[in-house]
Amino acid sequence: SSAASDVYKRQVLCSLGDFDTLITGDMDGKTETKLVEAYDFPDIEVLLVGHHGSKYSTGTTLLESVTPEVGVISVGDNSYGHPTEEALLRLTDAGMSVYRTDMQGNILITVD
């Protein structure tokens, strides 16, 4: 269906040699599960954390599938409580280094 195909258009995988970055946009956990079941992703070096660190995004299934080394959360002052403590705990439990635009400002990622 059109709605189902839209689910897969919300993610971007950027690769340069062995360096891979995954951007999942505002996907929720259920959609992330469908995504990892549909595609064989490489290990991810940098993951742009979904939905500004919402408790409903960047779930354990995704994290176990793509094993990211670094998580970047694009977030500013907001009334939603993003990123949530639950999301931050999932990221650190997955062994990721986490960077946040509300704490570090602009984040520059370079690849040699």
Task: Explain the meaning of each model-derived region.
Residues 26:
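Gly/Thr-rich phosphate-binding loop signature of adenosyl cofactor/nucleotide-binding cores
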Residues 10-14, 107-109:
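Short beta-strand scaffold segments in enzyme catalytic cores
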Residues 15-21:
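Beta-strand-turn-beta hairpins that frame and shape the catalytic cleft
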Residues 33-106:
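Cap/insert and terminal regions of metallo-dependent hydrolase folds
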Residues 21-23, 49:
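Residue-level marker for buried hydrophobic side chains located in beta-strands
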Residues 2, 110-111:
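Conserved GTPase G-domain signal focused on the G5
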Residues 1-8:
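Short, small-residue-biased leader/transition segments that mark boundaries at the very start
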